[in-house]
Amino acid sequence: MADSENQGPAEPSQAAAAAEAAAEEVMAEGGAQGGDCDSAAGDPDSAAGQMAEEPQTPAENAPKPKNDFIESLPNSVKCRVLALKKLQKRCDKIEAKFDKEFQALEKKYNDIYKPLLAKIQELTGEMEGCAWTLEGEEEEEEEYEDDEEEGEDEEEEEAAAEAAAGAKHDDAHAEMPDDAKK
């Protein structure tokens, strides 16, 4: 069986046989733990006994809605679904273990990198100033300063014009009584 796991199935019939063998293996483990898939699917007490053995997340403890579709499937398909769920749980456990080990490895190497990063920071430090500037930069700075002065004059004129227009508008409304405005 180890050879067939390492090599991909060459034909669809081999793939079906491999899937069936995996399902039988999972079902055999389920049978050793308290019954086969038919009794586990039909007997809620044996399923509860299996659940009590394994710690579960809050999402798994939540009541699950009945799925009429799965209940309408033949027993052989239900067994395959159950086998796939068990295999997925195994994969999830392996993935969780991988994530924990990966985080530990990252932390280990971050600790190793800290002195090197500190030396890099010490060597690079702040940017050093230059004694020379480009000719194009001086011209751009002068143009920018001229534009700023012109913009400020225009803004002051616009603000004065708006204030005068606002005062005229307020005076027109002040002469009318409140009843006439409606």
UniProtKB/Swiss-Prot annotation:
Biased composition (Acidic residues): 135-160
Keyword RNA-binding among UniProt keywords: no
Protein name (database record): Nucleosome assembly protein 1-like 5
Tissue specificity: Predominantly expressed in brain.
Record-stated family: Belongs to the nucleosome assembly protein (NAP) family.
Compositionally biased intervals (Low complexity): 7-21, 28-49
Organism of origin: Homo sapiens (Human)
One record GO biological process: nucleosome assembly
Region (Disordered): 1-71, 134-182
